[in-house]
Amino acid sequence: MSLNPRDVVIVDFGRTPMGRSKGGMHRNTRAEDMSAHLISKLLERNNKVDPAEVEDVIWGCVNQTLEQGWNIARMASLLTQIPHTSAAQTVSRLCGSSMSALHTAAQAIMTNNGDVFIIGGVEHMGHVSMMHGVDPNPHMSLHAAKASGMMGLTAEMLGKMHGITREQQDAFGLRSHQLAHKATLEGKFKDEIIPMQGYDENGFLKVFDYDETIRPDTTLESLAALKPAFNPKGGTVTAGTSSQITDGASCMIVMSAQRAQDLGIQPMAVIRSMAVAGVDPAIMGYGPVPATQKALKRAGLSIADIDFFELNEAFAAQALPVLKDLKVLDKMNEKVNLHGGAIALGHPFGCSGARISGTLLNVMKQNGGTFGVSTMCIGLGQGIATVFERV
């Protein structure tokens, strides 16, 4: 494949093991320490990359307060081998934050404003809860549906509009755990998980190289027994078909194709296009549809050209309508989230965009795909998507 000098390539990807937010492996690890460990280990793994060449560390994080405040990107960078002369910024696009970090780095490279970037994101939802310090504007209900900030209810709405049944959602949730467990047993996550020290359920320090969120004993019967989590009267969305609340971080080394060639590095993939899109906040989960369609148009590709998809599983009731309208629902078992998704692995907000993109690149590498799309919905009505081509 012939690459242009300013093409944007992904050199490597790593992530932490995903930890439960309640008493999980990361309960005694701060968000910036988790981030710094990941960045340091990924740079050690790629010793052709001089940390002094890093133009900017661009880190996604949603709830930027407490240990995640005061520009956590810089806080984490200062704890690594990256010199003080490199810059750092923290970005938030809610659920799409670290994919936005990737897009920001890509746009800088394309416009000759840097060659080497560290991107990724973190969310320690055990230490900084989802709603900590949040004060929504009371006048917002004059402009958007009152329940637009309640993601579970927006998923209920989207599922109802598209005729998604409770049984379909339970089957999707089961699939996520089964595929994530299978991927773990087969070593499919080995290249992406950077081992970290943490604490087990008995309080003993140990090294984790696996996700503690996956429930291999999940069954349709156990899922069917769960009560609706958001709408007690007639709701279909449960805890078992929603993304888990977890702690985690993800990281990528991104650079220009020219710099990768100069350093003798074989990239994982090149970015072919990027897009964001807005939708009605009341159906925020539908955002991946227009974002993906826009990204594919920019890449000159069609849905049929895409070998693999990673769609963030915010809710089964949200993911299924997206797959249906993207016309890949009938190809789901061959193309979509082959290593499970956020229902099994969790959705640490600032981490997830880079996480699903990196997992996609590993799926493509392991299965021989050429084109892949990572996409996700975003709270308050947005979608984001990236089209990759394997190099």
From Swiss-Prot:
It catalyses: an acyl-CoA + acetyl-CoA = a 3-oxoacyl-CoA + CoA. Its EC number is 2.3.1.16. InterPro entries: FadA (IPR012805), Thiolase (IPR002155), Thiolase-like (IPR016039), Thiolase-like_sf_Thiolase (IPR050215), Thiolase_acyl_enz_int_AS (IPR020615), Thiolase_AS (IPR020610), Thiolase_C (IPR020617), Thiolase_CS (IPR020613). One of its GO terms (biological process) is phenylacetate catabolic process. Disulfide bonds: none annotated. Pathway: Lipid metabolism; fatty acid beta-oxidation. It is an enzyme of class 2 (transferase). GO terms for cellular component: cytoplasm. Catalyzes the final step of fatty acid oxidation in which acetyl-CoA is released and the CoA ester of a fatty acid two carbons shorter is formed. Pfam families: Thiolase_C, Thiolase_N. Heterotetramer of two alpha chains (FadB) and two beta chains (FadA). PANTHER family: 3-KETOACYL-COA THIOLASE FADA, 3-KETOACYL-COA THIOLASE, PEROXISOMAL. Its main location: cytoplasm. This is 3-ketoacyl-CoA thiolase. GO terms for molecular function: acetyl-CoA C-acyltransferase activity. Belongs to the thiolase-like superfamily. Thiolase family. It is found in: Cytoplasm. Keywords: Acyltransferase, Cytoplasm, Fatty acid metabolism, Lipid degradation, Lipid metabolism, Transferase. The active site is at C95, H347, C377.
